[in-house]
Amino acid sequence: SSWYFLRYVDNHNNEELVSREKADAMLPVDMYIGGVEHAVLHLLYSRFYTKFLCDIGVIDFDEPFVKLFNQGMITGKNGIKMSKSKGNVVSPDDLVRDYGCDSLRMYELFVGPPELDAEWDDRGIDGVYRFLKKLWNLLMDSKDKDIKPTKEMIKVRHKLVYDITTRLESFSLNTVISAFMEHTNTLVAIAKKEGGVDRDTLDTLAVLLAPFAPH
C-alpha cells in the first residue's frame, strides 16, 4: 500500500513499476483524502518509498501527495466510534426509504465541517428533505415559463456559482449545502414576485447541485 498510487497510472506495465513518461504526466497525487489513523503507517511509508524511488531515478518527485485532507468520523451517541461490536451502527436503508438517497447524501455533508468528527443524529435529515422539496417545486413551477432574467436573478446566479466554487475548493462542504439553501430561499422569494425564475439560473442551479443530489 506504500506505492499503489504509482501502479494506478500504469497498471498494465509488466516491464517496470511505472513508466517515467506516465509518472511525469500524472504524478504526484494532487489530493490524498483519508483518516488521520493512516498518518503513522501508510502515509509515512509512502513518503519513504517515494523518496527512495526518486533517489534511484525511477520517478522525478520526492513527495507522494501534493495535498493531504484528513476527514473526521461520524460517531454514534456520546461520540463513540460506530462499530458492529458496539451495536451502534446506523443502517441507511430506512432513511433512504423515508427521505431518499439525495437527502441522506446532503445531510451527511451538512452535519459539520468534514475535517471534524460529528455525532450522528438522524433527526436533522428532515430539514434537508424539506429543502430539496422546496428546490424541486421551484424548478417545476418555473421550467415551462418564459421568464426574462432580471438583474436580481442574474446577481443570485453569479453569487451562487461563486459561493459553491470557493467553498468546494476549500473543502467546506457543509457550507456548500448551506449556500444552496440560502440562495434557493432567495430564488423562491424572487419567483413569488416575478412569477418564476429564468431558465439560465435554473440550469445553473441544477448543474451545481448534481454532484450532491444526482438523483
Where are these regions (language model features)?
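Cys/His-rich finger/ribbon microdomains and the adjacent scaffold used
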Residues: 1-35, 44, 51-56, 62-67, ...
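Active/binding-pocket-proximal capping segment
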Residues: 72-75, 182-183
